[in-house]
Amino acid sequence: MNKLVDAHCHVITDPDNTFCGDDGGSQGTLRCVMSSNPYDWNNLKKLAGRSTSKNDICVGFGVHPWYSHLFYVGSRRDKVSHYQDVLEYKNEEQFDSLVQVLPEPLDLEEYIKREFNDTLVSVIGEIGLDKLFRLPANGFYMQNEKARLTTVKVKLSHQETVFRRFCRLARHTSKPISIHDVKCHGKLNDICNEELLTYHSVKICLHSYTGSKETLLGQWLKKFPPDRIFVSLSKWINFKDPEEGDALVRSLPSTCILTETDYPIDNPDPSYQKALTEQLQYLNAQIARAWDETLDASQAALRVYENFQKFIK
């Protein structure tokens, strides 16, 4: 049986540090686990250190746009001034309430200098831009805590500054990147052209890609060599409409397709782990069918595995 690939998954964001660092074992899946913020990064380090199957976990290091407001770039400012600078808001009351619960911002340069480990980290990610995300009332998104959404957003200019910094880290270390992109397809492509196009060792994974096929084929796959662009497909985004998912698969070179769950993996419950495995099996079956109805899922799984090895090396 061919090993399954989860090219983009997570651990839980846990500010209270109660995380147990248990993924229930690899479950026969090669996992590329993203970090998005300082809290899940601490948890991911624990998981990588405790894993009994270290060859099945690839570690990502990054700052997701949903958490980019937790960092400042350049000179330190007081807490209120920082959040005034990086947040976009019209409701002063909402802003004041958020500032009360948000932590003191961290120096992005110090964070990278202190935490980045070239030996441990395989991928720079998750990084990117998000035009739609609104901050929850508790200050930042946590998988296990439900909070109402405010109307406050992180300024795109700040998201871009953070994203560019991680692009430069990828250039410096020759690591691949995994990109989050919501309604910023052209902007992200422009930035990657500026920051990465001439750095041939940096590969790019467009995770759960939701842009147009025209942007994908006419920009990403036209300007970048096909061996540098990968598209990671998820069940709940790319195959929400199976026909659209099939059409996306057929439009792509078979050499650039990856599979993902985009779910936290640090829940050892067997039924939860089984559900993650079934998502990846579903994707392989859909990909195989889109290529050729005579193919079976194992053939797609083999190709995806080979693609991931090229992405990560």
Curated annotation (Swiss-Prot):
Entry's EC annotation: 3.1.21.-
| Residues at which a divalent metal cation 2 binds | 126, 180, 207
Named from the GO MF annotations, one term is: nuclease activity
Names of the cofactor(s): a divalent metal cation
- Task performed by this protein: Putative deoxyribonuclease.
Q: Which InterPro entries match?
A: DNase_TatD-rel_CS, Metal_Hydrolase, Metallo-hydrolase/TatD-type, TatD-like
Additional information: Present with 125 molecules/cell in log phase SD medium.
Tell whether Heme is among the UniProt keywords.
no
Taxonomic lineage: Eukaryota, Fungi, Dikarya, Ascomycota, Saccharomycotina
Query: What positions does the entry give for a divalent metal cation 1 binding?
Result: 8, 10, 126, 262
Protein name (record): Uncharacterized deoxyribonuclease YMR262W
Q: Which UniProt keywords apply?
A: Hydrolase, Metal-binding, Nuclease
| Superkingdom assignment | Eukaryota
**UniProt similarity note:** Belongs to the metallo-dependent hydrolases superfamily. TatD-type hydrolase family.
Q: How is the cofactor bound?
A: Binds 2 divalent metal cations per subunit.
Q: Does the keyword Ligase apply?
A: no
